[in-house]
């Protein structure tokens, strides 16, 4: 068993990170379409950006004024910077980092359950990263209702993976002070619950 950061650092070295883009693209596009709908301009942080593929995609949107990626893995950030010298990337602990300017959208895919206390992270992001009326939107595949994901901690040999229900995730958002909290699932199949998407505004 190993920490999430060490596991994903290894993925950055062996190229496994590239599969994350392929597997998560549809759900990420669903989230970005929802979050950016109706906006004439926006700034965005990708929390747990990995190799930066979401930032590279978002920065090609003419409406995007600023795109920032943050990740705890130095290998991932090194790779992101190598692939993209246009945008900003930071290797920092998400629980401690504060951006110089707040943003309109904070997006995160498959990250929050790797924290011992996800509610603490959501509180920190809501308070310190998001503008008034800004949005937090999160996607995860590891959650209680998605039974196919329950074996992942053992299969991936990762020490911290917090299993919560859809209702519990929504409560985390609400207790952080986020309003109009919504959730839905993208990509459901017969034995697959799909990506749980949760969002709310500041």
Residue ranges of model-derived segments:
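Conserved beta-strand signature within the Rossmann-like core of class I S-adenosyl-L-methionine
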Residues: 133-141
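Conserved class I S-adenosyl-L-methionine
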Residues: 1-37, 144-145
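Class I SAM-dependent methyltransferase SAM/SAH-binding core
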Residues: 45-47, 51-96
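Conserved S-adenosyl-L-methionine
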Residues: 178-189
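Short alpha-helix
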Residues: 161-176
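A short glycine-rich, Lys/Arg-flanked "PGG" loop and its adjoining helix->strand segment in the class I
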Residues: 119-133
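A conserved beta-strand element that flanks and buttresses the S-adenosyl-L-methionine
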Residues: 107
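Short, glycine-/aromatic-enriched active-site segment of Class I SAM-dependent methyltransferases
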Residues: 141-160
